[in-house]
Amino acid sequence: MKRTALLALTAALLASPAFADTLIDNANGIQIDPSGKLQHFTGLLIGDDGKVVRVLGAGDALPKADSVIDAGGRTLLPGLIDAHGHVMELGFDALRLDLVGTTSLQELQQRLKAYAAEHPGNGWIMGAGWNQELWPTKTFPTAADLDAVVSDRPVVLTRVDGHALVANSAAMKAAGVTAGTPAPQGGEIHNGTFVDAAQGLIEKAIPKPTASESDVAFQKAQDILLGFGVTGVGSMSTSLDDWNAFRRAGDKDQLRVRLMVYLLGLEPLKTIPHPTPWLYEDRLRAVGVKFFADGALGSRGAWLKQPYSDKPESRGLQFHSDAELLSQTDAAAAAGFQTATHAIGDAANAQVISTYEKLSQKYGTGRRWRIEHFQIVDPADIPRLKPAGIVASMQPTHQTSDRLMAQARLGPDRLKGAYAWQTVEKLGIPLAFGTDFPVESPNPFPGLSAAVSRQDLNGQPPGGWIPSERLSFAQALAAYTRGSAYAGFAEEKIGSLDPGKWADFVLVDRDPTKVDPQQLGRTQVVQTWIAGKKVWERPASAAPERGR
């Protein structure tokens, strides 16, 4: 009798719908629906597997749940996905000498002097974030400038964009670099400043971080990202050491942010020969390979079709011949990887588009070839993206940071295809947004602000810079959620709060649809949730770490 009753109870339980774990109620929910329009909702039902069961609208009957969370009327957004960031660099930079915002060479020297005093010893001093465009002289620092402050141990300070570094004499000596050392193809050397490919001459001598140091840096990076509501990242230029740090975190159940990994060049494919499946409950996947076609605008390494307006003897740096770039990207594609190629100048973008057109003829248009930055483009080249199935992976805050410099570097005519977000949208080209952190802050909200206004957080310039390229808020949010998920082949798992997807979301302190662009850019995250679990909460009277 008891056995019969037990069997009946078991059958009834199996026939009943699963009892969901968590109900988020009383929320001002905003997301992008599949058609690209804003969808408003008031609650989420989250299953015990961490996935969305149901999106609730106003007036819907509240389902039962083990736990009910009152959102207090806060705005709830899908977790923001940064399509292009450098995760380990973010963590390491947060632990090293911070040079972001220095307004002169003298301020850089002062910060270096103070840091050296606080960190005595014989170890290398590493720092990052300087930008000579913010200095009155607008000239690169030199080895002599660093020697004047620290000469007894190696010092290496990386430019904000990661495309140049300055080394003191001790660092150059350790690397075996002399006045007669030639710059490699795709690089330049200027009195101790090493641009693009030339950076490798110094970097080869820098002691590699230990596994323990890498683990600390990765956890630091995750803390920063979660504080800004970033729940997923396209992890660009990932080394095998970086990958191993991610795996160690996953093995210890310390992998919180979802990572779509793009390996740095072909060398890692000797160890990871094909794309991996999703690991650690969809927290980690090696999906693509990252390549470079040129350098950066700030160091005049971006490869242009015509000379720089402020340096007529230079067109920038071409990293590869057409044949070389095709051979490398084809090797990655043949192994099943997606390709993501850095291209900033109009010549570099044209080369990458041509390369991808050839790959599409061979592999089809469904491989989602990515152009990273797609920053300065000949308007005639932009329509070529959609037929080849190319994704434009762009960073809105590059436009606000680069505006004055871009005008000086390019002149007015070449700006017609610069940071052309609305043109990309109108042509139906898949658009993904990110920040390129730590080049810019990983905070996505200044990016959303820039996208809808073409202004910085101070409202400059009045009326917006090339305002015809502004996006609607729905378009901008789509690029930071659904678009970034699509760019990483993750749209079935993240990018929206549709039923069946992971319940990754953020609660913020204001409704982004009801504030001006500058207030949108100052949005603060209150809580960050991943897989239906709260993983970050703002301490009272505290802001998330800056993390530039």
Regions found by a protein language model. Name each.
Residues M1-F19:
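Gram-negative bacterial Sec-dependent N-terminal signal peptides
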